Regions:
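N-terminal low-complexity, acidic/polar interaction/targeting segments
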Residues: 1-201
Length: 201
């Protein structure tokens, strides 16, 4: 899918979208209502800009971290009060290289990031290892039926890359780890990092 050189940015603290991830969003601020109107009338794409965490409250001028994912608007329900509920699906990793402030919302000039694979056998093995870690460490954190549900989800994932980004979307919470994962080009390196993170949590 074609990714435009510029994408609207919805800046949020503690939030990161990965390829294949589906993120529900509630739009209520005036600037993001304007953004949504432009997105709907355009290519239906924008990205989540992760605000750098700090001890103070988040302000308009706070730093947006560079790595993100171009997202496609998959569903949108407009409410009578002018707010909206939508689903944004992650499409492709991007790096925000410049931010424009000439609209009510921020617009980022982005560079798409490719993923490389050097050893598919290692990737397949790492994917199986990651699935085992998820089942062993996370299946009982929500409810007793979670292991069965998680097994089915993992079984339905079509590729090792899908497995990695599913784990990243749902089980990586620290922004430094999310940014590092998005920044890595090589899929083997991404698996090494996420396995190291999740196996010690």
């Amino acid at each position: 899918m074609f990714i435009p050189e510029k994408l609207p940015i919805m800046a949020l603290p503690g939030t990161c979208l990965f390829p294949g991830g589906k993120m529900p969003l509630h739009i209520f601020e005036s600037k993001y209502r304007d953004m949504l109107n432009d997105v709907i009338s355009g290519n239906r794409m924008f990205c989540i800009g992760t605000l750098r965490e700090s001890e103070s409250s988040f302000e308009e001028g706070d730093e947006i971290l560079p790595y993100s994912t171009a997202g496609l608007l998959r569903a949108c329900v407009m409410n009578n009060d002018g707010t909206a509920n939508l689903i944004l699906e992650g499409i492709k990793k991007v790096k925000i290289i410049n931010i424009e402030n000439n609209k009510p919302y921020k617009v980022g000039k982005v560079q798409t990031l490719e993923t490389t694979i050097n050893d598919f056998e290692k990737i397949t093995s790492s994917s199986d290892q990651l699935k085992s870690i998820l089942i062993a460490n996370y299946s009982d954190r929500v409810d007793p039926n979670m292991e069965k549900q998680l097994n089915q989800i993992l079984k339905n994932l079509e590729s090792p890359e899908d497995t990695l980004y599913f784990a990243a979307q749902h089980f990586i919470s620290h922004q430094e780890n999310s940014q590092k994962l998005l920044s890595l080009e090589n899929l083997e390196d991404q698996f090494d990092l996420i396995i190291k993170i999740l196996d010690r949590q």
